[in-house]
Amino acid sequence: MTYLLATGVDPHPLCDANFFFHQLLSGVDVAIPSHASTPSQRRVFNLAKQMQNYMYLVGDAQARECVAVDAVYDPAGVVAAAEKLGCNVTAAIATHFHYDHIGHNGQSFGGPGMPLPGLRHFIELGLPVYIHASELAVAAQQISAQAEQLSPLGDGDEVSVGSVRLRVVHTPGHSPGSILLIAITDDGQQRLALSGDTVFPGSCGRLDLPGSSVDAMYSSLQTKVAALDDELPLFPGHAYGGPSSTIGREKASGFLRPSITLGSWRKMMAR
């Protein structure tokens, strides 16, 4: 991918001639507080640095097209980062509806108390925007959009960008509509998984929020995520525990351990 190297930004090690991937950390790679142009933007960018969100660009290197995943706080900066790397953003996907993954109008219940740019930016660009069907209505309200401006996703659905497919795995627990995305190239190879707030290295997303479910998370982790290939790279929604892991590593020492029973899981989460 010489066109990526020509930008002065090194491509991610998982990139090759056909597969494009880039990880962005909020407050460091985008939404950088020192780059804020207004006091309100500085507040947003300071929150971004505090929350340590990972955002992702995934797509087809040959077509030079990618999907933005969980692009919030500075969606224009995410689009600019993709363009700097030689790719055009053609769609956006959210792994779940929480404000730090889709943005917020600053008024709806459960927000940060200020407007946050996010999915609405991609709607205004005329791009398709995807979220799990169970969270579509509340997400639309949260970002002051019409429901028909969002596209629903369900378990097993795929979003294509060039020859790359992002397959949806519904993983309720952190939220009712949380999803994991598996990137698959046209040779059928599963290249990586984006786990949102379902799996972090050594842990999982919070289960004390409205709509969270301890039992649903256990089922998602032990029956869906743990069933994936041990070698599959895993990239989380926040820098809580590190930038990446693998399914096998989480089965050995994380919350995918097969020794965790439902009873022991409930006790762990009740602490």
Residues covered by each model-derived region:
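Structural detector of well-ordered beta-strand residues that form the stable sheet scaffold
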Residues: F21, A68, T90, Y130, ...
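Conserved S/T- and glycine-rich ATP-binding loop of Class I adenylate-forming
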Residues: V58, T95, T171
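Zn-dependent metallo-beta-lactamase
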Residues: M1-C66, A71-L85, I123, R271
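Active-site HxH/HxHxD metal-binding segment of metal-dependent hydrolases
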Residues: M51-Q52, C66, Y73-R165, I184
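Short Gly/Pro-enriched turn/cap motifs at secondary-structure boundaries
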Residues: N46-A48, L150, H170-P172
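Metallo-beta-lactamase
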Residues: R64, E158, R165, H170, ...
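Generic structural signal for helix capping and beta-alpha/helix-loop junctions
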Residues: A31, Y99, V138-A139, G242-S244
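Binuclear metal-dependent hydrolase catalytic cores
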Residues: T2-F19, Q23, N105-G111, G126-L127, ...
